[in-house]
Amino acid sequence: RDVAKYVMMPGNAIKRHVVVEARMKQLAEDADGLPINRVEYNDLSVGFITSGIAYNYVKEAMPEASVLKLGLLNPLPRKLIEEFAAKVDKLYIFEELEPVVEEQVKAWGIQKAVGKEIFTVQGEYSANLIRERVLGQTLEVDPAAQVPARPPILCPGCPHRSVYTVLNKLKIHAAGDIGCYTLGAVAPLSVIDTTICMGASISTLHGMEKAKGKDYIHNWVAVIGDSTFMHTGINSLMNICLLYTS
């Protein structure tokens, strides 16, 4: 038991912050020698800095390229990255979604690095993305075999079906939440008209009432599952109870 180390009340947290910063500094110094950060030198005309599944896409699309595969992303191995960047003619940073590695590398002054200028910040990457954006190849993809559409549906016997069927017959709108019951938004049930995030169904309905009045929501209900209700939905319900009983 070590309260000073494990209980982060303000006085302890200030002292532990010093320890955290010292640990991060040591990690940064050790990062260059960690075996999980691996350099594969091949053709030095092009190099990729990448990690995770994106590494597999690089190897599939351009197996002849040099690659720095990062296993530790925070902190980044600065010396290793600078040495790798200096040895390759063209440098690409291939990371999905936000340019976390790219921004840090460019902040170090490695301006030859190319990342989100040609790679998307949305969706999943693929080997074909590299072939298209780096190699300039026009992809000829065979059309997928025509198969019957099979949209997701609620499981047979699921009680959500019965609830949504009744709401549909009564022409009731529903503010939905996160869960399999979000499928109430699509045919043939077509009841849910809005879904934002976990726990938002109740608060959305409350917000509608505040903005538009009670008459606007007379034919609306909030639909929420048990786990989502315990996540943040209960807070919205408590807020309604407080406001309407005070």
Regions inferred by a protein language model and the residue ranges of each:
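Flexible, low-complexity linker and terminal segments
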Residues: 1-154, 159, 171-172
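Structured alpha-helical segments in the cores of large, soluble enzyme domains
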Residues: 51-58, 198-213, 237-240
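Short helix/loop capping segments that flank catalytic or ligand/cofactor-binding pockets
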Residues: 56-59, 101-103, 163-166, 183-186, ...
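Generic hydrophobic/aromatic pocket-lining and core-packing "Φ" positions
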Residues: 81, 234-237
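Active-site diphosphate/adenylate-binding microenvironment
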Residues: 142-202, 211-214
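A short, small-residue-rich loop immediately preceding and capping a beta-strand
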Residues: 216-231
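Conserved small/polar residues in nucleotide/adenosyl-binding loops
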Residues: 244-245
